[in-house]
Amino acid sequence: MVTIRLARGGAKKRPFYNIVVTDSRNARDGRFIERVGFFNPLAKGQEETLRLDLDRVDHWVGNGASTTDRVAKLIKDARKAAA
């Protein structure tokens, strides 16, 4: 099953997440099909917190990909910011 989820990066105590499309059987930070954005929960000042390619997300969801709860909330926030 294809899923859209967060893959953790960054340093210890400084998380940075890539939003990736992957097979659900792959490791959290392992192989992925496509990177569709990123999420930086510790962004300060003018730094970008969230960037998401909504066209590609719509493409994958339209083709049957599921999203995790957190990614679904991030997609909702990105749509609200884009409007």
Swiss-Prot record:
Keyword presence, Acyltransferase: no
SUPFAM superfamilies registered for this protein in UniProt: Ribosomal protein S16 (SSF54565)
Output the Gene3D superfamilies linked to this UniProt entry. Answer: 3.30.1320.10
Name its GO BP terms in alphabetical order: translation
Q: Name one GO molecular function term.
A: structural constituent of ribosome
Q: Which UniProt keywords apply?
A: Ribonucleoprotein, Ribosomal protein
Q: Which GO terms describe its cellular component?
A: cytoplasm; small ribosomal subunit
Keyword Ribosomal protein carried by entry: yes
Similarity section: Belongs to the bacterial ribosomal protein bS16 family.
> What is the protein name for this chain?
Small ribosomal subunit protein bS16
Species lineage, top-down? Bacteria, Pseudomonadati, Pseudomonadota, Gammaproteobacteria, Alteromonadales
Q: Which gene encodes it?
A: rpsP
